[in-house]
């Protein structure tokens, strides 16, 4: 199944129930988990080599690299912008490595600051601002039930030095 799994917990539960009922395996397209560096760090986390992990930072940022093909810019069809597209991979890795999936509180903001501009300077070509209905940046902070905290940063269009930053800090 492509990520994210569903748009709400009720739909996700239906998918899990169907998998159990039919005996089929259900997996979500979080391929970053299978990179050698991810597997190495996950093993270190599981072995306790990093101690008590109480802070994580999930980062997926691009410098003016908005995908202009497909349905990426259509909120109705895509469900959201960079948080749904690339940020979900960084957040998945962070939660997986921390082995912590129980949020207590979430706060965040989304921004559409560049999507309404005619001339974008975008690496993958210009877009029609009238068709750009998703956010171009999303930032959040998650407090987990055990007191751990996670900072989340996702953007297709920040004015940053590095053209592509995808990092998980623990």
Where are these regions (language model features)?
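NAD(P)-dinucleotide binding in Rossmann-like oxidoreductases
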Residues: 128-135, 145-170
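Short beta-strand scaffold segments in enzyme catalytic cores
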Residues: 140-142
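Beta-strand-loop-alpha-helix segment that lines the small-molecule cofactor/substrate pocket
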Residues: 1-33, 48
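Predominantly a Rossmann-like dinucleotide-binding segment in NAD(P)-dependent oxidoreductases
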Residues: 25, 32-132
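Short, well-ordered coil/turn segments that N-cap beta-strands
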Residues: 22-25, 52-54, 136, 146-150
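Short, well-ordered turn and helix-capping elements at secondary-structure junctions
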Residues: 5, 60, 154-158
